[in-house]
Regions:
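Short helix-loop boundary/capping segments
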Residues: 150-258
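Conserved small/polar residues in nucleotide/adenosyl-binding loops
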Residues: 269-271
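Sec-dependent N-terminal signal peptides of Gram-positive bacterial secreted proteins and lipoproteins
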Residues: 9-20
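N-terminal cleavable signal peptides for secretion/export
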Residues: 15, 27-114, 119-120, 200-201
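Short, cysteine-centered beta-strand-loop-beta hairpins and adjacent loop/turn segments enriched
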Residues: 68-79, 116-130, 207-215, 253-258
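N-terminal Sec-pathway targeting helices
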Residues: 2-10
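A structural signal for short, hydrophobic beta-strand segments that form beta-sheets
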Residues: 90-101, 148-150, 226-231
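Amphipathic hydrophobic-ligand
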Residues: 78-94, 127-135, 171-183, 219-228
């Protein structure tokens, strides 16, 4: 029979996997460093349309935010008071080059990110402690429309279990997830304007690797998916940055109409 600790760490691993296996993008609530430097190439002169930004090498975004765990916990049935993981993410454009995307030569950006997320004083299946997640990601973004070609993430998961007046640091596991999209995932449809909606059918190919003493690494998958997007509003994003008053909220859902998230797009920077 597996020990209670083993069950707890297995649940931690599976919860983190459920979040990161499909989406690695920035969180729902973000703050940006005002040192961002992004050039805009305008296609339209209309004040009501936002066009494709042109990134430069070493462009950088700093995020503060959270990962919402509630829906995943409810679906899993895990007994825990964990609701969110809070932390930071720094993204940098590290390369710009031409590669083949769906049999066509395309200019792409390579964006590398480093993130750290934590939840302190939580209880997982009767085990109190702190949950820590370190994440490194690499995203390949098509320059012509900011569509995501592929994403890969390396995720280190640690649970510091409370014991008397100190805690025991347990390495729950390391997970590597590589995901590619065909055609590339079009989270934007430029030029952007309120009320615009679009859908996309695509194939997601996901490969897993890594190690854990508590749970098996998942099998690779190939799945057919549908993504629906809508620009639902324009206004203040909640981020304390000079240009955020004119942000565009882009919401997304799956083929069943279930909300899968939202993001903000700004005329000078995007989040």
């Amino acid at each position: 029979m597996r020990s209670r600790e083993t069950v707890t760490y297995s649940l931690v691993f599976l919860l983190i996997l459920s979040i990161f296996s499909g989406i690695y993008g920035p969180e729902k609530v973000l703050e940006l460093d005002e040192k961002n430097d992004v050039k805009i190439e305008s296609i339209s002169k209309s004040n009501n349309l936002i066009d494709i930004p042109s990134w430069k090498l070493n462009d950088k975004w700093n995020y503060n935010g959270y990962l919402d765990m509630v829906d995943f916990i409810v679906d899993s049935g895990v007994n825990t008071n964990l609701q969110t993981l809070t932390g930071t993410l720094e993204s940098t454009v590290t390369d710009i080059y031409i590669t083949t995307v769906d049999n066509s030569s395309s200019l792409v950006y390579k964006v590398e990110s480093e993130g750290y997320y934590e939840a302190n004083n939580i209880n997982l299946d009767g085990q109190p402690g702190d949950l820590e997640v370190n994440m490194d990601t690499v995203s390949i973004i098509r320059a012509s429309d900011l569509a995501t070609v592929s994403q890969e993430a390396t995720i280190d998961i640690n649970f510091c279990r409370d014991f008397l007046w100190f805690c025991i640091d347990v390495s729950v596991g390391t997970l590597e997830v590589d995901q590619s999209y065909s055609p590339p995932l079009e989270g934007y449809d430029f030029p952007i304007s309120v009320g615009e909606a679009w859908s996309q059918d695509y194939t997601a190919t996901t490969t897993y690797s890594g190690s854990s003493d508590y749970v098996d690494i998942p099998e690779d998958t190939v799945s057919q998916r549908t993504a629906n997007y809508e620009v639902v509003s324009q206004g203040f994003s909640g981020v304390n940055y000079a240009s955020c008053a004119t942000s565009y909220n882009i919401s997304s859902s799956n083929a069943d109409g279930e909300d899968t998230g939202y993001k903000w797009f700004l005329s000078l920077i995007h989040i």
